[in-house]
Amino acid sequence: MQAVFLARSRMLFLTSDGKPPARFSFYVASKEGTTGRNQVRRRVSRMNITFLLNGETVELSDVDPTATLLDWLREDRGLTGTKEGCNEGDCGACTVMVTDEGGAKALNSCILFLPQLHGKAVRTVEGASGPNGEAHPAQQAMVDLHGSQCGFCTPGFVMSMVASHTNGATDHDTQLAGNLCRCTGYAPIIRAAKAAEEHPVPVWVKDKPVAPQATSSMLPGSSDELAAVYAKRPDATLVAGATDVGLWVTKQLRDLDPVIFLNRCDDLKEIAITDDEIRFGAMVDMNRMGGALAGLHPSYAEMIRRYASVQVRHAATVGGNIANGSPIGDNPPALIALGATLHLRKGDARRSIPLEDFFIDYGKQDRAPGEFVEAVSFPRQTDRLKTYKLSKRFDQDISAVCGCFYITVSDGTVTQARIAFGGMAAIPKRATNVEAALIGKPWTHETIQAALPSFAKDFTPLTDMRASATYRLETAKAMLERYFLEDQGETTNVLEVSA
């Protein structure tokens, strides 16, 4: 019997011939215990990349497009301070700080592919301390205030704190929501984060991104270049933030090739706000989207804050959250309620469709081979939007139900209603029968009660691990009632009850 270690999947198998099991035939184990899966066949998407690691320039040739930063740090560079906990972007143990033209960001290295780092600066926990061993204020505060017990999660917390300290962020509950600790109860960690505020940002962590030239057509530098290469390779997987695709590799062990990375398409990162329209490019990350919406639709911005951790929101994109077609995505229902239009491109051809028409069925969207999401837009309008996210955990959890309501009233009569839900059907879906039961009726509690039976006409939700069908349906009804009560000035704030 021989042991075969598959580093990408963190699995150890005992086999008679020293070869990986058939299911994992695309892996080839090396003596060092790292994966050599690219020895099986020549990959289309291999590329050369350049970035900074803890202040030093790194140039990598012939890079596996789905090699994660976490694996590379630990196995190729011997930087084992960055830990693997969940390997899906939930626990924060693998957090690193990545600096690009938008500033310093905390990101999960377990679902961050190496080509996404091209031109950026990476700092790990080993690089948080100074050149002469000086502790970063976050590190020193964690020591002084007893923020570490077993220590496994500590490097991730430190790097989240280093990133927030670099940016001057002081909303520590939010900044650390993506880091889990099973020992401390969090109080000493929060105290450490607050204590670090009193100290200036060390000069050694003030990284600047590099500006290398493009090295591969699979790393397009604009939407025009993307359109050209995707038209030639419509079979390619598009990678924006990898918060979803990353799990295809780390959890499903899928072999992706070819892969096109969108991180250099700066024109897809534009936000345009005019008197008439609000438009988000497909590569706008969720943190930037939330910031742009804070003064326009604060309920939407708050929902985005709860949508996922800071690390995930820095990576997840507007376009990716739409294109994956998830029935439990939080972004599409809110956009549908705002009357959003989706802008798609294939080669030089462009088309625009109502966002709700993009979702056809579970796993099926109105997107042709070689076509990609370019932007999403919606009218600039008076804020009548409310979003309600129901999940088992308050922060960083998948919704059981996400309800979004935009109802306009004139002279006591409902003149317009756009209501959309996630978690209630196989796709993000409008409640058209409920809308019809409201429009033209008096804006009264009696009208709300009369509209509630229409929910059963619009939705037949499933029972799963997050909620039962009955619970989902009753909750959706309660959300409409909550919208009405809040519009009437009633207080419906959810109280946090301690155990």
Enumerate the language-model features and the residues they cover.
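Short, Lys/Arg-enriched N-terminal segments with co-localized hydrophobic residues
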Residues: 27, 31-46
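Eukaryote-biased recognition of intrinsically disordered, low-complexity regulatory segments
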Residues: 47-56
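C-terminal structural segment of proteins
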Residues: 57, 97-98, 102, 106-109, ...
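Short, contiguous acidic and Ser/Thr-rich linear segments
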Residues: 58-64
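Immediate flanking context of iron-sulfur cluster ligation sites
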Residues: 71-92, 127-152, 165-182, 309-315
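Acidic (E/D-rich), amphipathic helical modules within compact regulatory domains
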Residues: 86, 90-95, 103-114
